[in-house]
């Protein structure tokens, strides 16, 4: 990927956190390389923490609602700290992964989603929760770290109802 494209993607990803209409936020995310489905709502303060070139590792499917000040982490490492020298002894010090939010999920305000996590369809993540592992479909997960506290029973609509 050429340098200008990388810079453009970074600018788009950063601009998303400022107050713009939802449609413009979605457009900026798509321009940055994130896969965003239809009818998605992303509130102000959204942050995607990742290195340039990893934006494709975030997938947000159709009809997902993301509350204000949600952070999704795709990459995390100690940057220029001397801790970086420990990565050979402790490989887990650098984290790179994908985040996949399945259709009809709702992420509450201030939630943090860490790398290598899938949020199942029709799941709810409570406000302020820190999601460290997969959340199964039709679940409510809350807390730090987030734990499933309830399974949802959702009736499927038929064409006649």
Question: For the regions a protein language model found, what residue spans apply to each?
Answer:
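Terminal amphipathic alpha-helical/low-complexity segments used for targeting or macromolecular assembly
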Residues: 1-34, 38-39, 63, 76-88, ...
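Short, conserved clusters of charged catalytic residues that mark active-site
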Residues: 23-24, 55, 108, 126
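Flexible, glycine/small-residue-enriched loop-and-beta-strand segment within the central core
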Residues: 44-118, 144-145, 152-155, 159
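Cytosol-/stroma-facing membrane-proximal "stalk/adaptor" domains immediately downstream
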Residues: 118-119, 125, 133
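Conserved functional loop/turn residues at catalytic and ligand-binding sites
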Residues: 133-134, 145
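Extracellular disulfide-bonded cysteine-rich modules/repeats
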Residues: 138-139
């Amino acid at each position: 990927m050429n340098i200008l494209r990388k810079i453009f993607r970074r600018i788009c990803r950063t601009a998303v956190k400022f107050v713009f209409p939802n449609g413009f936020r979605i457009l900026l995310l798509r321009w940055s390389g994130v896969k965003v489905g239809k009818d998605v709502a992303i509130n102000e303060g959204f942050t995607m923490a990742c290195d340039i070139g990893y934006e494709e590792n975030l997938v947000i499917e159709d009809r997902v609602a993301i509350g204000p000040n949600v952070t999704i982490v795709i990459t995390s490492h100690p940057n220029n700290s001397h801790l970086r020298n420990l990565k050979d002894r402790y490989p887990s010090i650098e984290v790179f992964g994908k985040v996949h939010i399945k259709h009809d999920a709702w992420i509450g305000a201030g939630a943090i989603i860490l790398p290598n996590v899938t949020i199942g369809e029709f799941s709810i993540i409570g406000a302020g929760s820190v999601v460290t592992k997969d959340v199964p479909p039709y679940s409510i997960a809350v807390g730090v770290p987030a734990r499933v506290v309830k399974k949802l029973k959702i009736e499927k609509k038929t064409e006649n109802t």
